[in-house]
């Protein structure tokens, strides 16, 4: 569902007094749903750091920057020096924070983050394949990829299979969330 559909559904629930409060399972910059709930004074909780009005919003979050840094540190400790990042756009705050942690780790280890080593998409409908193909087939390609979430990690694993890259022999992948998706891949994802 897009923001407009979710907003319509919430406005309908409010008009018909079908809900006392709302839980938003994401945090996104310029989110019309969160803006509407805030402007109407409706009780809501956001899973993820609030993008706007954080001091006036109830939210539950983990330290995504630290998680990104620690995951990248792990890859570095495993011997990887060319580590790429694959995630959703910076509009999704969790991904922006994980990318920031990835960049902090690289800098800490004396590696300059390269914009070309980051592939970001808005939706799975985006044409991410050319950018991923360029990244993964270039001379000196990454030996590891930090991925913002398990769904994208599955997408990456399938794409690597098309390219003939074997996980983890040719490319290591580390992701987040430890969801069911991470356990149904072959081999299972590190998450």
Annotated model-derived regions:
Residues 1-4, 14-16, 39-42:
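Short low-complexity stretches enriched in small and charged residues
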Residues 1-10, 21, 103, 107:
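Amphipathic helical "hinge" segments at domain boundaries
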Residues 2-5, 25-31, 151:
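Short beta->alpha connector loops
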Residues 7-8, 30-31, 125, 129:
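Structural motif corresponding to alpha-helix initiation and N-cap regions
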Residues 10-11, 15, 22, 180:
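A composition-driven signal for long, intrinsically disordered, charge-rich low-complexity tracts
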Residues 15-21, 139-143:
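Short acidic/histidine-rich motifs immediately flanking catalytic phosphotransfer sites
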Residues 22-25, 146-147:
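Short N-terminal targeting/anchoring amphipathic segment
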Residues 36-46, 50-191:
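Bacterial carbohydrate/catabolite-sensing allosteric modules
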